Amino acid sequence: MDKILEAVVTSSYPVSVKQGLVRRVLEAARQPLEREQCLALLALGARLYVGGAEELPRRVGCQLLHVAGRHHPDVFAEFFSARRVLRLLQGGAGPPGPRALACVQLGLQLLPEGPAADEVFALLRREVLRTVCERPGPAACAQVARLLARHPRCVPDGPHRLLFCQQLVRCLGRFRCPAEGEEGAVEFLEQAQQVSGLLAQLWRAQPAAILPCLKELFAVISCAEEEPPSSALASVVQHLPLELMDGVVRNLSNDDSVTDSQMLTAISRMIDWVSWPLGKNIDKWIIALLKGLAAVKKFSILIEVSLTKIEKVFSKLLYPIVRGAALSVLKYMLLTFQHSHEAFHLLLPHIPPMVASLVKEDSNSGTSCLEQLAELVHCMVFRFPGFPDLYEPVMEAIKDLHVPNEDRIKQLLGQDAWTSQKSELAGFYPRLMAKSDTGKIGLINLGNTCYVNSILQALFMASDFRHCVLRLTENNSQPLMTKLQWLFGFLEHSQRPAISPENFLSASWTPWFSPGTQQDCSEYLKYLLDRLHEEEKTGTRICQKLKQSSSPSPPEEPPAPSSTSVEKMFGGKIVTRICCLCCLNVSSREEAFTDLSLAFPPPERCRRRRLGSVMRPTEDITARELPPPTSAQGPGRVGPRRQRKHCITEDTPPTSLYIEGLDSKEAGGQSSQEERIEREEEGKEERTEKEEVGEEEESTRGEGEREKEEEVEEEEEKVEKETEKEAEQEKEEDSLGAGTHPDAAIPSGERTCGSEGSRSVLDLVNYFLSPEKLTAENRYYCESCASLQDAEKVVELSQGPCYLILTLLRFSFDLRTMRRRKILDDVSIPLLLRLPLAGGRGQAYDLCSVVVHSGVSSESGHYYCYAREGAARPAASLGTADRPEPENQWYLFNDTRVSFSSFESVSNVTSFFPKDTAYVLFYRQRPREGPEAELGSSRVRTEPTLHKDLMEAISKDNILYLQEQEKEARSRAAYISALPTSPHWGRGFDEDKDEDEGSPGGCNPAGGNGGDFHRLVF
C-alpha cells in the first residue's frame, strides 16, 4: 500500500486524480493493518512530510501520520521512538529544519502516554538546547518556540533552562529578515514575537532567569562586531518587568567592568530599536539608561550617542507605528542636551519637511506629534537664541501651531537636563550634587559674602531688571553692568548647581568694607545701584561726545539725558514739604530715591493702630480705606484725620495716607484676598475722591454721611475689641513662664515693643509718611523769618518706582550702651501693598523678594533670600495652594542651596526663628488693568537674546562642567562600590550646617549647602 501511495503522489496524474487515489488509500489505512504495513505507511508519511518539495506531498504525509496515529496507536508509539526523533532532528547538516521540528510536534500530539513518551520528552529536552546553540534561523527558532509552548515537558530543566534562555537571546540577535516585501516582513515579525513570547513564558515560571538573560542581552548588544545584532532583540524588552528597570540601570551604570566603548555601543544599538514596530516600553528603557548614565556623570557617552543618533530617531516620526517611542526618546535627547546647540541644529534642515509630512498625513497621531514637536522646537529656540537665519524656516513651518508660554518652556527645560539627574554618589561626595530641583542656581559663599549673594539673587529674580541687564549691548563704558550681565546669563543658563560671583564681587567691592567680614546688605545694595547708575550716565555722556566729535555737521543741542536702567527699574521721587508754623511759609524739595528706609516707631506708638494697618479678618473684609472721621471721636482715639496730610496751603491739597495690604498671617488665603482687593480698587479710588470733597464741605454733611460716620465707629470698636482679645491671649501665654516667651530666648537683642503692638510693614510706611514736628534742637531755619522756627515736615511720594525697595532700619546705635543693636520685632509683611501717591492717586505693589538677616548684630549673622519671579500677572491667575503658578512659587536662596518655599514660610520665619528677621523687601509695581497692561506684561515676559560671546562662554563652561563631573565620578566610583548602602557618616552632606543653631541658613564658604562645588568664577 505504501508503494502504491508513493507512486501516486510522484506520478504526473492531475491533482484531482491524485487526491481521489489518496483518499482511497487513507480509507484503507483506517482498517486493521499488519504491523509491517503500518510501519511502512508511517515511514512514508514522515518522509513526505519532511522532505516533500510541494504542498501535496507534505499534506499527504501529514494525513498519513494522523490516520496511523489515531487508528494504530501502538504501532505509532513503536514508530515514533526516541531513536526516530533523534534521526529526524539530526538528519541533515546543521540545525534541524522547521519541517523536521513540525513533524516532531505532530508526532508528540499523537504519541500516547507511556514509557516511550517519557523517553522522547527526555531526548527533546536535550535536543532543543542543542538546536538553539546551533543558532537556527527565524523560522526554525519560531518552530522550537511553538513546540515548547505546546509541550512544556520539552523545555530543558534544571540549570539547562537558564542556559536555554540565554541561548534564545543569542538566537534573536542573529535573526535576519529572509525575504523582502510586506509579507516577508510581517512573517519575520511574527517569528520574533513567538520566540520572545517563549522567553516571557519561561521567565514567568522562573523569575530568577530574568537578570542573567539581561546580562546576556547586554553582552550581545555591547560587543563591537562587524555585523550589529538584529533589532529583533527589541521584542524581548516588552516582556521585561518595569519594576526591575531602576535596579538594572543603576547596577549597569555603576558596573566598573563595563567600559565606555561597550556602553556607547550598547546604548547606540538600543536606540536603533526604536524602529522595531512591536516593541512596547522600548522608549522607557532607553530613557532610563540615559538617565542612569547622566546620574553617574558619563557625559561623554551621552554627548556622542546624542549627536550620532538624534537624526535617525527624528526620522522615525514619519512612521505612525513607531512614532510614540521615537518622539519620547527624541524629546528626552533634546531636552537634556542643553549645554550646546549642536544637537538641535542637526535637526533644523529636517524639521520643515517633517512638519509638512505630518500635516499632510492628517491623522490624530500626526496632529499630536505636530503639537509636541512644535513645543519642543520652541523650547530649543528659547534655550539657544541668537540664530535667526537658521531658525526662520523652522518658525515659518510651525507658525500655525500652538506656542507654549514661558512657564511651560522653563518647566520642560528644567526637569530633564543632565545636571538635574540625581547622582548615585551625591550622598557621599557633595561635589557631585545635582542642580536644584527648582531649576535655579545658587551662589557660592566666598567667605562671609552671603550679603552679596542675597542681594544678587533678589536682583536676578526681579525679572524686569534682569531682562534689562541681559538686553544690554556689550559696551566697554559699562564694565560693571557687563559683569552683572554675564553673572545673570550664567544664573539663567548654566548647568552648574552653583556658581561663584568672585569676579563680579571684586568689581563691585565697596571700598570701606573689610574683606572676609560680614557687612550690611542694604548698604551694599545702595552702593551697587549707585555705581551702576553713575557708570551708565558716564558711559552715555562719553558716547554722545564721541558721536558729536565724529559728526561733520555743526553740533546740535545736546539731547535731554535719558533715564538709566537703575532709574527706570528702582527710581522713584519723593517730595518733602516743610511748613513754618510761624509764618506758614512752605518750602518744597523733590528728590529721587532708589529705596525707602523705614524706621520703627517709638515704643509708645506700639498700641496705636493707624488706618493703613487696621486689618479685618479675611473672611469678613479685606483691607480698605475707611470713611472720613467724625467730630465725636474722643482725644484718646486715633481717628482717620490723623492719617491725612495737613492742609498747609491752598495750593497743597490734602492727600490720603491709606496703605492697603494683605496680612502675612493670612497667607493661606492670599489668592482670594488679592482677587477681592483688585475688584475693589476702582471703588476705593472713587471713595477717596468723595471723602476729600466731604472733608472740605464738612459743615454741609447730610444724613447719609452721618451714617457713614457711625459705620466708622463700629469698625473701630471691632478693631479695638480684637486688639484687646489678642492682648489677653498673650498675657495668658506670658503667665506660663518667661522661658516660654520668644523674647526670653534672645537676651542679646532688643525689642521695642511687646506682642500687643506687633507691627506690619504698613505701620512702618505710615510712620514714614506721617507729619513730623521740628521743634527744640531740631527746629527749622525759615528763610522768610530768617530764624529757627518750629515747623512741620510732610513727606509724599510723587512717583512710584517699578520696583519698590523697602529697608527696615533694624540696626541702630544705642547711645546708652554705645554699640549697634538690632531690633528683633516681628514685622508682618503684606503680599499686596497699596501706596498713596501725591494727588490722591494710589499704586499697588506685589511682594517679590525678602532678604532675611539671621543674627543679633549687623557685624555677624547670616543673610538669605526668599524670592519669586517678579513678573506681573492678574491676581485671578495666581494659581492654587496645591499647584501655584510660577509667579506665585517662592524660592529660598541660601548661598549654594536653592529650594522651594512658600509665602507662609516667609511670613512665619521670625516666629520659628526669632533671630531671623526680614530686612530688605522688594515690591514690584502692579500694572493697571486694561489692554496696555496686558501688552506690557507679555513684553516683559519675553526672554532676551544673549549676545554671541556670552552664549558661547556659557556653552563652553557647561561642557567643561560635564567633563569635570564625569572625571570626578570616575575617580570616586572605584571607592563607592565598597561602601555600605547607607552609612551613618555619609549623611548630612546636603544639610545646612547652621540648622542646629535655629536658623534656616549658615554662613560658611559653601553656603547653606555646606558642600564643596566646582566653582565657576566670573
Swiss-Prot record:
The modification Phosphoserine is found at residue 613. Ubiquitinated by CHIP/STUB1 in an HSP90-dependent manner; leading to proteasomal degradation. This ubiquitination can be reversed through auto-deubiquitinating activity. GO terms for biological process: protein deubiquitination; proteolysis; regulation of protein stability. GO terms for cellular component: cytosol; mitochondrion; nucleus. Expressed in testis, pancreas and skeletal muscle. Residues 552-561 have a biased composition (Pro residues). The active site is at 450 (nucleophile), 862 (proton acceptor). Keywords: Cytoplasm, Hydrolase, Mitochondrion, Phosphoprotein, Protease, Thiol protease, Ubl conjugation, Ubl conjugation pathway. Disulfide bonds: none annotated. InterPro entries: ARM-type_fold, Papain-like_cys_pep_sf, Peptidase_C19, Peptidase_C19_UCH, Usp38-like_N, USP_CS, USP_dom. GO terms for molecular function: cysteine-type deubiquitinase activity. It catalyses: Thiol-dependent hydrolysis of ester, thioester, amide, peptide and isopeptide bonds formed by the C-terminal Gly of ubiquitin (a 76-residue protein attached to proteins as an intracellular targeting signal). Its EC number is 3.4.19.12. Residues 999-1011 have a biased composition (Gly residues). The keyword Cytoplasm applies. Residues 673-691, 699-709, 718-728 have a biased composition (Basic and acidic residues). Residues 441-926 form the USP domain. It is found in: Cytoplasm; Mitochondrion. Induction: By FOXM1 transcription factor. Belongs to the peptidase C19 family. Homodimer (via C-terminal region). Interacts with HSP90AA1. Deubiquitinase that plays a role in different processes including cell cycle regulation, mitophagy or endoplasmic reticulum stress. Inhibits TNFalpha-induced NF-kappa-B activation through stabilizing TNIP2 protein via deubiquitination. Plays an essential role during mitosis by deubiquitinating and thereby regulating the levels of Aurora B/AURKB protein. In addition, regulates the protein levels of other key component of the chromosomal passenger complex (CPC) such as survivin/BIRC5 or Borealin/CDCA8 by enhancing their stability. This is Ubiquitin carboxyl-terminal hydrolase 35. It comes from Homo sapiens (Human). The gene is USP35.
